[in-house]
Amino acid sequence: MQNINPTSTAAWKALEAHKGTLENTTINDLFQQEKNRFADYSLTFNNEILVDFSKNKITRETLNLLRRLAKECALDEAKEAMFSGEKINRTENRAVLHTALRNRSNTAVLVDGKDVMPEVNEVLAKMKAFSERVISGEWKGYTGKAITDVVNIGIGGSDLGPYMVTEALRPYKNHLNMHFVSNVDGTHIAEVFKKTNPETTLFLVASKTFTTQETMTNAKSARDWFLATAKDEKHVAKHFAALSTNAAEVEKFGIDTDNMFGFWDWVGGRYSLWSAIGLSIILSVGFENFEALLSGAHEMDKHFRNTPIEQNIPATLALVGLWNTNFQGAQTEAILPYDQYMHRFAAYFQQGNMESNGKYVGRDGKVISNYQTGPIIWGEPGTNGQHAFYQLIHQGTTLIPCDFIAPAKTHNPLADHHNKLLSNFFAQTEALAFGKTKETVEAEFLKAGKSLDEVKDVVPFKVFAGNKPTNSILLQEITPFSLGALIAMYEHKIFVQGVIFNIFSFDQWGVELGKQLANRILPELSGDEQVTGHDSSTNGLINQFKAWR
């Protein structure tokens, strides 16, 4: 991948000038000028996902310049480098090949001259065989009872992805009860212990190195809890499996290495749900549905790799997002799924985007000072968010572009719930784009029998400026296939932006310093003596903690 500061390109400079030409133009103006705006500014994937980006403050010229920017930043070259197994994660000297995990075509993917697909398929086959034994009840616990509960112990990518997907695909789940433990706060796992029976519980310990502090602390507590009932350490093998590559530590823990499911250093944590880390997904919805999830992602991979940029959905979303953050002044993006099963989707891509593109050093090793990299990502399901933070989106002083996501078909057709939900989905993007003028507010008061003199002090508060950018992403239905495609779409959006931002999207050095300092502080917490080795604030906090505990 090349080192190209995007602000040095002709396209960026042209975009700066172009921004000025739209300064007094609103989204409403653009709809008045372009009668076919919806058709011209929307794309469809596989007749399953419709992406409408028409309610952004963009024109054809904007899109053409953004596409030029992508070209001048060598996006196509970077894309091929990723798919072909080049080590584009240069700070860790690793390939980036989560796409190989869902490569349903089985065409060879080479890393250091070796095809990785045989190993990928071998792990998939092993996961299938294991999951079928557990789901069918053939796998027995130490007292001969079938497994009823599965507890996934992991953190970050080893938790967020599997948890999000198992929740999103809850309509497809089987009889097994799924639990996810991530926080090192003992409360998290203690609450799971209250709901489970050691005789019928299977723990999945998800840690590539089998040394992750939070995960191994929870895993050891789970082992202690289990052995308090089971007594004999040989029973651990019937109730624990490992998603790891450290066979020595796995064996030392008491897990049979036959029940160890490996993955590779070219799989980043936040892109790992497609790997052995997805075992909890398989145990929840079955292997066929997991395969459909992989297939949906693979189809989006093909679309992203092979489709010209003009019709390329992930690239288009990336470019529009970049326009909003770097040329319209936004610092944040909200992801708002109008589907309760998708309640962890925003949290998942909060990690996906912010850990990938939350960087301030460019690929050239220089500090980035004249453009924005990754935005702040957040969100909640609709309609809950409407009664919480939409006030600020509509009438606040901060510009917040939003992605609205909804399925046309619901898995739970109760009375008119879904029509009411979707009426809000459609209404919100309309309200954000077009707002409500002072004249409309006054007309509404007059119609209600009020005089303008009576209401003149209230009118300004009921005006909506509009001109707030949104994307609408409408799925036919949330299925394993369409969810896989949707996740891959957002993954590739993040990749495109990282290429243009000239950063390394697949490392995460920003998480290291806090961990290092925590390791230094931990032994200081065990005694009663005063701590003096930090700044006055940290010393004061630690010493107050010691006094109060």
Swiss-Prot record:
<dbReference type="GO" id="GO:0097367">
    <property type="term" value="F:carbohydrate derivative binding"/>
</dbReference>
<keyword id="KW-0963">Cytoplasm</keyword>
<dbReference type="InterPro" id="IPR001672">
    <property type="entry name" value="G6P_Isomerase"/>
</dbReference>
<dbReference type="GO" id="GO:0005829">
    <property type="term" value="C:cytosol"/>
</dbReference>
<dbReference type="GO" id="GO:0048029">
    <property type="term" value="F:monosaccharide binding"/>
</dbReference>
<keyword id="KW-0324">Glycolysis</keyword>
<dbReference type="InterPro" id="IPR018189">
    <property type="entry name" value="Phosphoglucose_isomerase_CS"/>
</dbReference>
<protein>
    <recommendedName>
        <fullName>Glucose-6-phosphate isomerase</fullName>
        <ecNumber>5.3.1.9</ecNumber>
    </recommendedName>
</protein>
<dbReference type="Pfam" id="PF00342">
    <property type="entry name" value="PGI"/>
</dbReference>
<keyword id="KW-0312">Gluconeogenesis</keyword>
<feature type="active site" description="Proton donor">
    <location>
        <position position="355"/>
    </location>
</feature>
<feature type="active site">
    <location>
        <position position="387"/>
    </location>
</feature>
<comment type="pathway">
    <text>Carbohydrate biosynthesis; gluconeogenesis.</text>
</comment>
<dbReference type="InterPro" id="IPR035476">
    <property type="entry name" value="SIS_PGI_1"/>
</dbReference>
<comment type="similarity">
    <text>Belongs to the GPI family.</text>
</comment>
<feature type="active site">
    <location>
        <position position="515"/>
    </location>
</feature>
<dbReference type="InterPro" id="IPR046348">
    <property type="entry name" value="SIS_dom_sf"/>
</dbReference>
<dbReference type="InterPro" id="IPR023096">
    <property type="entry name" value="G6P_Isomerase_C"/>
</dbReference>
<comment type="function">
    <text>Catalyzes the reversible isomerization of glucose-6-phosphate to fructose-6-phosphate.</text>
</comment>
<dbReference type="GO" id="GO:0051156">
    <property type="term" value="P:glucose 6-phosphate metabolic process"/>
</dbReference>
<keyword id="KW-0413">Isomerase</keyword>
<comment type="pathway">
    <text>Carbohydrate degradation; glycolysis; D-glyceraldehyde 3-phosphate and glycerone phosphate from D-glucose: step 2/4.</text>
</comment>
<dbReference type="InterPro" id="IPR035482">
    <property type="entry name" value="SIS_PGI_2"/>
</dbReference>
<dbReference type="GO" id="GO:0006094">
    <property type="term" value="P:gluconeogenesis"/>
</dbReference>
<dbReference type="GO" id="GO:0006096">
    <property type="term" value="P:glycolytic process"/>
</dbReference>
<dbReference type="GO" id="GO:0004347">
    <property type="term" value="F:glucose-6-phosphate isomerase activity"/>
</dbReference>
